[in-house]
Amino acid sequence: MADAAASPVGKRLLLLFADPTASASASAPTAAAVVSGDPGPALRTRAWRAGTVRAMSGAVPQDLAIFVEFDGCNWKQHSWVKVHAEDVLALLLEGSLVWAPRKDPVLLQGTRVPVAQWPALTFTPLVDKLGLGSVVPVEYLVDRELRFLSDANGMHLFQMGTDVQNQILLEHAALRETVNALISDQKLQEIFSRGPYSVQGHRVKVYQPEGEEVWLCGVVSRQDSVTRLMEVSITETGEVKSVDPRLTHVMLMDSSTPQSEGGTIKAVKSSKGKKKRESIEGRDGRRRKSASDSGCDPATKKLKGDRGEVDSNGSDGGEASRGPWKGGNASGEPGLEQRAKQPPSTFVPQINRNIRFATYTKENGRTLVVQDEPVGGDTPVPFTPYASATGQTPLAPEVGGAENKEAGKTLEQVSQGMVASAAVVTTASSTPTTVRISDTGLASGTGPEKQKGSWSQASGENSRNSSLASSGFGVSLSSLSQPLTFGSGRSQSNGVLATDNKPLGFSFSCSSASESQKDSDLSKNLFFQCMSQNVPSTNYLSRVSESVADDSSSRDSFTQSLESLTSGLCKGRSVLGADTQPGPKAGSSVDRKVPAESMPTLTPAFPRSLLNTRTPENHENLFLQPPKLSREEPSNPFLAFVEKVEHSPFSSFVSQASGSSSSATSVTSKATASWPESHSSAESAPLAKKKPLFITTDSSKLVSGVLGSALSTGSPSLSAVGNGRSSSPTNSLTQPIEMPTLSSSPTEERPTVGPGQQDNPLLKTFSTVFGRHSGSFLSAPAEFAQENKAPFEAVKRFSLDERSLACRQDSDSSTNSDLSDLSDSEEQLQAKSGLKGIPEHLMGKLGPNGERSAELLLGKGKGKQAPKGRPRTAPLKVGQSVLKDVSKVRKLKQSGEPFLQDGSCINVAPHLHKCRECRLERYRKFKEQEQDDSTVACRFFHFRRLVFTRKGVLRVEGFLSPQQSDPDAMNLWIPSSSLAEGIDLETSKYILANVGDQFCQLVMSEKEAMMMVEPHQKVAWKRAVRGVREMCDVCETTLFNIHWVCRKCGFGVCLDCYRLRKSRPRSETEEMGDEEVFSWLKCAKGQSHEPENLMPTQIIPGTALYNIGDMVHAARGKWGIKANCPCISRQSKSVLRPAVTNGISQLPSVTPSASSGNETTFSSGGGAAAVTNPEPDQVPKGAGTDGRSEEPLKAEGSASNSNSELKAIRPPCPDTAPPSSALHWLADLATQKAKEETKDAGSLRSVLNKESHSPFGLDSFNSTAKVSPLTPKLFNSLLLGPTASNSKTEGSSLRDLLHSGPGKLPQTPLDTGIPFPPVFSSSSAVAKSKASLPDFLDHIIASVVENKKTSDPSKRSCNLTDTQKEVKEMAMGLNVLDPHTSHSWLCDGRLLCLHDPSNKNNWKIFRECWKQGQPVLVSGVHKKLKSELWKPEAFSQEFGDQDVDLVNCRNCAIISDVKVRDFWDGFEIICKRLRSEDGQPMVLKLKDWPPGEDFRDMMPTRFEDLMENLPLPEYTKRDGRLNLASRLPSYFVRPDLGPKMYNAYGLITAEDRRVGTTNLHLDVSDAVNVMVYVGIPVGEGAHDEEVLKTIDEGDADEVTKQRIHDGKEKPGALWHIYAAKDAEKIRELLRKVGEEQGQENPPDHDPIHDQSWYLDQILRKRLFEEYGVQGWAIVQFLGDAVFIPAGAPHQVHNLYSCIKVAEDFVSPEHVKHCFRLTQEFRHLSNTHTNHEDKLQVKNIIYHAVKDAVGTLKAHESKLARS
């Protein structure tokens, strides 16, 4: 819930309803009047209604309503007011108490008292359809005179300590009483709603909105210290009512005034009991719920659950709670100068110091913080203070910038009692997407009256919500799916600014009613609403104080100048031109208007000619060219809005410059002439290549802090242009501009490559594609070398040592202070920054893209970001921050150049938004970790750009973009020019053949992700950080590339979680609350993270991923490697594919779009020219024996989701059956159906350019499935393919099914009742609701082609026997493969057993069985090991004193804190074993020992002994050539692949046969498990007979039994392993059995992953009879190594005491299962050990394919010779 300050209950309210008789534009004159400088009369004459909020209701913004008791009305006339009703024009909520200037005398007791200042209440707009802008509504006390002041000058916060003694108060008792009453009421509301107080036992009266009596009197019998809910015993009736003081007005009836300590009301500290803390610690912070989550209504519950996230004690500034101003007091705050002079009335943000947090560190290194019971229940709540809904209030830092903050500080100091007076005193829990209609200074006057369906309407709505949120309507806001926070809105929104023609300065209705609006669909986009506030004029206080020209004429001239400059845009030109060419260039659009927002605030020194600007219109989205976005929209300031040029989607982008970016030299009309200078599409690519973006040049050559002649001439340089910089970034990202950043991260080690790396042709190829990475990277452009005289050295990291106090007092950067921590958004921050300090002589050369160019020039360069999933390796050393060097800091301040954040948020700037990791640092239990470690863990490390304002205050400037990469960053992601180690030509082919399809699906998934990026959004680039694994904060899957990040806290979500949340209706999301499986963490102050507010971010720089995809297709075509990838642009089918001979007519299904023989881009995207592939691939014609003809390598603009698979055109086989074939018509029907549907799929470009097309509505066909265009794919359906077990399960057409013949059609888990899958079933497990042709045909074909499932077990058994015979014959045939490999066959010929673990040729025969998904046994490994190392006595002697946990295998009970010696001593001696309560010796197993990844460190000798002697080293060794995990560069966190030990006693008795040592489960990776020791226990009789019986009942085969009798070998454990494809059937059986036993089946649990089942003989029999599933029963003897395929369910039953050691690996054959399982594991609860994705399968696949492609490319000469 919300605190007092956040809740509107009990506050004064001003309402203005629409006059039904007035015209729609009636309010326009009001706005105009406001702009003209005298807002008072125009606004005062409206029919304002004042009253007090007595109650509120509504769980979602649309339903939010308040009960208002209007002044001067009787009780019957009081009513509920729907906050967002159409007739509500303005809703203003009480803010702070201030001293406001007053001209008219006050009438007191019949006498007129002239006063200069008078106490007044400020009001903050929650709903503002009038466009109040910077107007400050105030209501003077006593006479309640309402005034609208044009600015906050002359106002200052009422100080309780000193102002109570003010002469005016002492002289006028009525005023004094009014002030005291007001303060008292505010104190009471705070007491009721928050703080270390309890009103238990006090008499109160509760308001009854709709009761017969207005007030009910009673006594508080109980008040919850956390939720603040109180139980009131009603005096009259005696009933007990539960009252929430934040929703219903409660007043204290006691005469005494509550006091904080020792008064009538005592502070109550909440318990700090260990038990409470432990119970909370045990849960994942993300799933946490507050103590009282149950038992209250959903809205309350949600709010409580959302209570602040971690950072509620705001140490470094404002993180915990906002002062009233911050929240949104519209009341004026002193002007800049005034405030600077003001005494320490500056706010000190309220800090909730009473919140306690329990922390614990997870295995991945991430610290989770769980909010424990706050002391006294002083919890921050989601009610956000409201960051002024209309940017007018300095309170909204976003609006007022630092000044606001400072102002806020001033205000907040008020008195303890006044804490609650500000509507925003509380933490800003507002959601990040707050949007408001009128931003500071450019409040769009366009009210709803102007455009119902467009911008203003949307903004209006948002401004309402946001204001609500901030003002404290937070009640339901935190749970709203709608973003509500004001300042925060910006930073969370991506994309184009709302460019309504809005006014400059603080004008309000700047755009004339007649001006055309944007497309109405844009108005619905929250992003645009947010961006509408993203204006440069960030501080209306400073504007006012600087006498900002606010007359309408200036506005008109502004718009005119904007229009006149539309010709300035020239596409495709490099930003740095050689000379100025006057006149517009071709490609400019003359009729375009540039929004006023793109301009900084006008000040007298800011000539209007500076307004001649263009806003960027180009898109950076790799695949989306904005369908027909209104071209007026400027781009997201965070990342340049770029346009694609020629090749790469991310290559030379050009953003238009905005006026503010031009320097003083371009102030005149000459500015336009300079624009084209650097824009010529013909030159853009070459220039991009010639001029480096990252330059580690001599300090003397870098941009200097010298301000150009602008200063001397009196015209402002950019640094002096208002407070804000143009909100629209300009300048092509490809600009080779010198960056004051390092070319490589301080912690980054360059990838290990051969000596030829610098001349890497691949790198050059990529450079060409990206338009940047060329050899000239290290040379700076000549003009730069000449122009930049002042020295500047590369920046690294930053500390606060040299920071002056001014940074806290400086109003220009209030956005950076704590107060703005949540209410301010990055966009606004950027808008405020302006391009400070750029020499004017440089700006003249920056052209129309000046601002963007300047940004790059100033250092928006590469860098790395510290990721999310904090698992990391050994601490890394980070170089000294640049800010440790005073001279560098001075130069940075002079030049205003942006630089990368090179330290943790805490060390760099505590007053800026802190990332999640840095927020948690202060709560970590173990502070002794190295500072460098926490620095690298910072999520903004080398990701966020910072800049000093002209006042020397640090603020956020933006984030890196994908184009701002350097060769070192790119080298990590592209093939090395030299041969990769450990991979040869044949291995490369094999890897590509097995992994190429998965890689292609991965690329398709990334394209799908890019299509989800809105056209207006900009993609950021988060550089990989050495030793840190990027993880999704929701499902803990490793982030591969595209993901979404919160700009404020670094919260990141993967594609799947993002899509899942975005596709779900908001109402459903709110209802789910914390109980959903994938619940999202809150932002800094408990604000909800809304998908639309997150910033799309990629990890792989540039277009490397898509180019590797092209290379994969090219390589497979050139080398004749089989391919079955689903993308339409894939190469020809494998030459190995046999011709179909089943008699069905062979009709090619090549689509017209694929008919071109030329290769087109694999990654072609929306409107971009195709990326030129390094080498066009030529598929050899006639290759192979099937006579296939050449197939186009790629299809132009192939649909990203892939159309139906292209089939190679082959001539009909000689034995083709006649057309009269019984199935001929079915086959042709299916083919025709596929062709028709394929036609509709269209190319990627056409699909993406459909303006109305939803990101989910791509009509596409997977090679294996048709995805319903209306069904959002909840998970990586393209990635995973249609089934869990077989990527080829579903045919690309009915024809494939018909060709399969009886007995060949696999069964999918989705359709277990049908012998084969539906022809075009959806790849997501969506219930088929409509009968369709494929469904209908299923039944026909089932009867014609395939035998129905046999229900008769005897028949099934017979069928299986035949199948087994076939398998056995096939297996035996493998003997021919390598007669020299000693092996045998177990399990009736289904299990390969290799006898010589050291045979170098084992891998050949092993691979044939392994690729079939079969387990393999290798015997005799123990003969190679040093047996003395693996004996129980050795372990007991070396590690006996360690404390461990044991598990009782019989009942799964855990025995904690036992010495490991106790376990080992009873390993073979039963009498020494620990005993249970009934006195029986327990069957124990060691739990996680050695712990985690400690095996190698704890037992180095054993580690070496094991790794040297593992069989099949090609697969099992860490650097094995077929172990794909070895391809992952050391730069990344290596997956934990073991070894792990499994030590347990044997289960000997008959009763034990029903339990397992290790229950049924499966692993995401392949594994080899070696039995290194078998201990046969002594004492209490022999157990050999029982063991033999267990083996016999375990279905072991005769050959296995002979090993016991004839070979005298020691049996250790009985395994049951099942094929990965049978996992779903096993689940089905276990669910069925569970239901029979009355067990529940929660959604985040899985019968296999839960490891709660052991399949005993009865269950195994049922599985076989009911589902036809038969596994492998394997007895593992001493020295046997069992190879378990990834995804294969298996269980273990120890026959005797065993020591087993397992090592994991990733084989090419089973990568598809790794893919699928990673998705499965996402759905598990956090308690599952497999929940977290440690394998990083996508990264492994990427780098394996990258190395394979590089190797093949290096061997192409051989191909040419052959």
From Swiss-Prot:
Phosphoserine found at: 493, 547, 557, 561, 767, 774, 779, 799, 1254, 1260
Cofactor or coenzyme needed: Fe(2+)
Keywords per UniProt: Acetylation, Chromatin regulator, Dioxygenase, Iron, Isopeptide bond, Metal-binding, Nucleus, Oxidoreductase, Phosphoprotein, Transcription, Transcription regulation, Ubl conjugation, Zinc, Zinc-finger
Basic and acidic residues compositional bias, start-end: 299-310
Record PTM Phosphothreonine, positions in chain: 615
Covalent cross-link Glycyl lysine isopeptide (Lys-Gly) (interchain with G-Cter in SUMO2) as placed by the record, residue numbers: 789
Modified residues (N-acetylalanine): 2
Biased composition (Polar residues): 453-465, 713-746, 1146-1163
Entry's cofactor comment: Binds 1 Fe(2+) ion per subunit.
Start and end residues of each stretch annotated as Disordered: 253-350, 426-468, 574-613, 713-763, 806-853, 1146-1217, 1285-1306
Single GO MF annotation: zinc ion binding
InterPro entries the record matches: DUF7030, JHDM2-like, JmjC_dom, KDM3AB_Tudor, PWWP_KDM3B
Low complexity composition bias: residue spans: 426-435
PROSITE patterns: JMJC (PS51184)
Reactions this protein catalyses: N(6),N(6)-dimethyl-L-lysyl(9)-[histone H3] + 2 2-oxoglutarate + 2 O2 = L-lysyl(9)-[histone H3] + 2 formaldehyde + 2 succinate + 2 CO2
Motif LXXLL motif location, chain numbering: 1294-1298
List of residues binding Fe cation: 1561, 1563, 1690
Localization: Nucleus
C6-type zinc finger segments: 1032-1057
Primary role: Histone demethylase that specifically demethylates 'Lys-9' of histone H3, thereby playing a central role in histone code. Demethylation of Lys residue generates formaldehyde and succinate May have tumor suppressor activity.
Family: Belongs to the JHDM2 histone demethylase family.
Record note on domains: Leu-Xaa-Xaa-Leu-Leu (LXXLL) motifs are known to mediate the association with nuclear receptors.
Name assigned to this protein: Lysine-specific demethylase 3B
Gene from which this protein is expressed: Kdm3b
